[in-house]
Amino acid sequence: MKNLIKKFTIAVIVLSILYISYTTYISMNGIIIGTKIHKNDKSQFMIEEISESSYGQFVGLRQGDIILKINKEKPSDKHLKWGYLSHINSLDILRSGKKIHLKDFDLVTLNRPYSFFLFVLPLFFYFLSIICIFYILKVNKKRRSFAAYILILLLLDISIAYISAGGPFRGHIINRYINLFTFISSPILYLQFIQRYLGEIGKTFLNRISFLYIIPIFNLGIEFFQDYLQVDIDFLATLNLVSFATLTLFSFSAIYLHLNKYKYAEHSFILKLLILTNTLSFAPFLIFFVLPIIFTGNYIFPALASASLLVLIPFGLVYQFVANKMFDIEFILGRMRYYALLAMIPTLLIVGALVLFDVMDIQMNPVRQTVFFFVVMFAVFYFKEVMDFKFRLKRFSEKFNYQDSIFKYTQLMRGVTSLQQVFKELKNTILDVLLVSKAYTFEVTPDHKVIFLDKHEVGPDWNFYQEEFENVTSEIGKIIEVNQGFLMKVGERGGSSYVLLCLSNINTPRLTRDEISWLKTLSFYTSVSMENVLHIEELMEHLKDLKQEGTNPIWLKKLMFAIEEKQRSGLARDLHDSVLQDLISLKRQCELFLGDFKKDDNPCREEVQDKLVQMNEQMSDVISMTRETCHELRPQLLYDLGLVKALSKLVAQQQERVPFHIRLNTGRFTASLDLDSQLNLYRIIQEFLSNAVKHSQATDVLIMLISIQNKIVLHYEDDGVGFDQEKNTEHSMSMGLSGIKERVRALDGRLRIETSEGKGFKADIEIEL
């Protein structure tokens, strides 16, 4: 089905290009189709045949008229194309013995204003549609959307309906059928596109839309058998307009009802965009041409002029089909309602004044003038806001310019680094905008003591406002007005509140709603900025204290140890995946070679065999050492089975190599720890054992790890040589106690060491859970 519609779409594109080329040639040459000319016995040009709906009939020509002059010249073959009149500005004809001068041929000459709506705009619309079609085909190479082909057909349908609606080729019978079918079927194609488009995003719309094609086919049949049925041409025109209006209103209602049903669905914004484009496109044509013709027989604006906004439909659909990001339709609708309300009042005043003073243009009735001035006013208000936003034009003086002042204030807050700077910028902003001359900052303590913060300035007598200071501290942004100004809470810290007192030399008027809203916004911005500045100041003080103490904070130690463990793990993986695997492979090759070598008869066999055996043993030692190194760098058992199993393996490995006895007791350890804490405890015990091997000369080592209530206790004890803590500070550092202490601090624990020369070494570590 998709391949069939694809081929059909391509065929329609080719046929449309041929049709547009044909109509363009007719328009460029001003050929009046439907008005057949031939020479009579006297070699006079006579109108032999004229179609009912042709442009020749529209300008007043009748069958049997004899043409005396064309463009004030004697008729000749140069004024004919295919037997039809062409390039006509005026005609002098003879009818029933009377000479008649006809000159109303504006619609067939491209140098007239009417040609813009009859030929230029429709042709421009067609070429834009072709560009959009190629863009849709390009995008659809990846999407492979069925809706894309229906959208292409819709673009071509509206383009052909628009360009075939008028001009010198109106009398062409085939052109009339093409215009009728494409004109009435455009709302149906529109609904089919919406159905397919929503279906491809998983939404249902309408079923059996194809049955609606019965309406244009029925109208086409009546048009075809018009003479046989003896149907009046005015009735046919009304029937066609009623059919189009019915289908258009049906499509609009279907989309609206679907939106009302799924107003909170994720695709509701798509439906709103469809309703917007539908209304803007069809409403002018329906209101100013179709409905007036149906009910009164006269139109307000000509069909081609009122239908010019139909171009919004395909472009809106193309944008919706290819765009990755949509405009905010709620915002657009809100702005349109706002601009429409603003434009309505001056429009009614202007038109009312024109009617009252009787200065109305003859060609512009009150309805036309109302529409014209409304559109102009609407466009003026829209472009005014666009220009204001784009160039940030100052619509007011700096006083009372609340929005710009907030924007400027937030920009200034980005560069403040102290509380005094925050207060300074706040005071300057308020003094620039409001009718106050002075601003002061105060701190109100929890016991309602008022402290003046601007020490470098002469402060006011704030004792008059003691009660107001007590009442204003209830919430941030609260404002209390006094005779010559107001008080406002702008922030808090702990139990203290920061209050701004703004005064004037004279009694100030009451604050307006806009001013109160603006001040509250400023106070909230100030409160956030104060919190940030205070946090930064506290952090700087804390860093200074740490620098003086010469120790790193716990969070930094944890980070450093985490980075160290990550580096250890990476190195262990590299050793295991590269060096260790190469060694194992080399050892395997050596074993195979040694096995083959024993089978051969070689006088030097024993000597070479001994060397190979020695090399094999050395490789075994290297492999074993590499494995142990990988395990020490990254204790895989700890990651897989936990701390207790990893410690048991660590003690077992150490026991094979050390000259002393190691006892490990973890039976009462049941705490659940995160991986970082387990790694730190593992490294601490590993460091204790390493120190015992290097320095203790012990014969017995005891390690106990227990958990009691919300506490973890690690006890280490050996009977080695010990050391004097007071005299041997450097020695203790060399024993690795520095790393142990840092890890204990990272765990937020406490380390207690008992040792002296010749009396062994004891260490207790307590960690709160």
From Swiss-Prot:
Its EC number is 2.7.13.3. PROSITE patterns: HIS_KIN. It is found in: Cell membrane. Keywords: ATP-binding, Cell membrane, Competence, Kinase, Membrane, Nucleotide-binding, Phosphoprotein, Sporulation, Transferase, Transmembrane, Transmembrane helix, Two-component regulatory system. The chain crosses the membrane at residues 10-33, 114-134, 145-167, 236-257, 273-295, 300-323, 338-357, 362-383. It catalyses: ATP + protein L-histidine = ADP + protein N-phospho-L-histidine. One of its GO terms (molecular function) is phosphorelay sensor kinase activity. Its main location: membrane. Residues 34-113, 168-235, 296-299, 358-361 are extracellular. This is Sensor histidine kinase ComP. The lineage of its organism: Bacteria, Bacillati, Bacillota, Bacilli, Bacillales.
